Amino acid sequence: MGMGGQSGEGCSSGDCVKPEAQYSWEEIQKHNLKTDKWLVIERKVYNISQWVKRHPGGMRIIGHYAGEDATDAFHAFHPDKTFVRKFLKPLYIGELAENEPSQDRDKNAQQVEDFRALRKTAEDMRLFKSNPAFFIFYLFHILLIEFLAWCTLHYLGTGWIPAIITVLLLTISQAQAGWLQHDFGHLSVFEKSKWNHLVHKFVIGHLKGASANWWNHRHFQHHAKPNIFSKDPDVNMVNVFVLGGTQPVEFGKKGIKYLPYNHQHLYFFLIGPPLLIPVYFTVQIIKTMIARKDWVDLAWSVSYYVRFFFTFVPFFGVLGSLALLNAVRFFESHWFVWVTQMNHLPMAIEHEKYQDWLNTQLAATCNIEPSFFNDWFSGHLNFQIEHHLFPTMPRHNYWKIAPLVRSLCSKYNVTYEEKCLYHGFRDVLRSLKKSGQLWLDAYLHK
């Protein structure tokens, strides 16, 4: 129950400071309902029940922290915290009671403070400052590859070999554009968020034909609560796959069998990588833009298709250009799925456990060994741990903070997992097979 503070003495009615309400964690944790949401940032309590609908990052991501301490998430997602705090002022309703710890649910206070000290060290090392030349070169190399695809057809014709080379080049440019839009989407390039948002729309919209707002809505939830059912959209497999160690058993005991999940590591090759981008994402993106009347993103997306067909219809005609588009999407989808899943799918996938930021991210992520190829191939997402801990950090600085992250994890016996690229791919299938077997055992013995 909230406890009123003491007002100042001898002040006029207009100058009196209102007593600050104080709240216990027990009371705050009750406010995690659909229409009643409180959260805590730096011991200050905010009522976000109505404001969630206006939250620029989306109502779901902030709602996932209702009833919790959101301090580390607040710092992770907002580069310009001074600006963002202006929006918090009207939502402020009080403070944590003096006898309440800063961390909720018996979290390790010293570990949390050490992680925050690590973030301060990264700021002092200027690791959140981007190198413009890196991203200019990266954009240039994407545009150059697209130009080489056009040159291949212009100078070599439209035979099978030039067509295959064109598909290969466009697949590379699309995959790399996917990693580049990720940088701008995370506000990790420009100091001003508005420039990140603008270039993000250009890269994901004009260069890829997708939607910035759709991506933000999905991806930020994934970062806020990775591998947590009902909160991370990336583990919502619409009953096609069962993941982790908990969901398969739950499905099995309930007799749920939409598909033969014990064979999911096999049918993954048929309906996972081949269909995610060409079918599922494409339909979802178009549907979302129209349903939300997101005409700006729709215009950017249309500009991609206009440019694509304007470029390739003279070589292949309309149907041939459609075939080219889908071939590129098909191969890009394989690239995207394997890279994104190797960092998360073999890790813990559970219901909410209310862990601190460090443990939440480390339980759900692993790294792939750095190398020139691995860095380029994955868009530096082989440093997935560092990226999840510091999502606004420019990717070219991950390697600088990685040793300090390792040291912190070692201090508190938090598993820091890193593997080679082959083992990353292998563990995706092993994870699916293991989860499928758990489902079968529970299903047969329900």
Curated annotation (Swiss-Prot):
Pathway per its UniProt entry is: Lipid metabolism; polyunsaturated fatty acid biosynthesis
- Report the main location listed first in the record: endoplasmic reticulum
| Membrane topology, from the record | Multi-pass membrane protein
* Motif position, Histidine box-2: 219-223
Matching entries from InterPro entries are given as: Cyt_B5-like_heme/steroid-bd, Cyt_B5-like_heme/steroid_sf, FA_desaturase_dom, Fatty_acid_desaturase
Coordinates of motif Histidine box-3 in the sequence?
Answer: 384-388
Single GO BP term: unsaturated fatty acid biosynthetic process
List the subcellular locations: Endoplasmic reticulum membrane
Which major enzyme category is it? oxidoreductase
Molecular function (GO) terms for this protein are: oxidoreductase activity, acting on paired donors, with oxidation of a pair of donors resulting in the reduction of molecular oxygen to two molecules of water
**SUPFAM superfamilies per record:** Cytochrome b5-like heme/steroid binding domain (SSF55856)
Which intervals of this chain are the motif Histidine box-1?
A: 182-186
Name the protein family: Belongs to the fatty acid desaturase type 1 family.
Domain remarks: The histidine box domains may contain the active site and/or be involved in metal ion binding.
What's this protein's name? Fatty acid desaturase 2
Q: Which residues cross the membrane?
A: 133-153, 155-175, 266-286, 308-328
- Taken from the record's topology, the Lumenal segments are 154, 287-307
* CDD domains in the record: Delta6-FADS-like
The EC number(s) attached to this protein equal 1.14.19.-
Q: Record's superkingdom? A: Eukaryota
Entry keyword Protein biosynthesis: no
Q: Which GO terms describe its cellular component?
A: endoplasmic reticulum membrane
